[in-house]
Amino acid sequence: MIRTEKIMNKKIKPNKKIYVGNLPFETTEPDLKTLFSSAGDVMSVNIVKDRQTGQPRGLAFVEMSSQWEARRAISMLNRTNFMGKNLLVKEARTSLGFRGR
C-alpha cells in the first residue's frame, strides 16, 4: 500500500524510451540507431544481453529526444520487418525499482 502511494505521488515524466522486441540476435546498436533515426533524433540505444553469457537476448531499449519522436517511431516501426523478423516496438514501461534475479 505504501509503495502504491509513493508511485501515485510521483510526477510522471514524458516517456521517450521505447522497448524493441523480437530482434535478430546479430543486431548491433548502429543498426538500431540507423533504423530509428528515420523517426527523429536517437539519444541512446541499449541492446539487452544475458548477464552470464553476454549474448544478446533479442530485445533493446531506444531513447528518442522527445516523446513525440518516440510515439512517431512506435507508429512507424511496430511490426516492421527488420533483418527477417517482425519487430515489436512499444513504449517502454517505467521502472518501479524492481530488478530481475
Locations of regions flagged by a protein language model:
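Intrinsically disordered, low-complexity RNA-binding regions enriched in Gly/Arg/Ser/Tyr
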Residues: 1-38, 43-57, 63-101
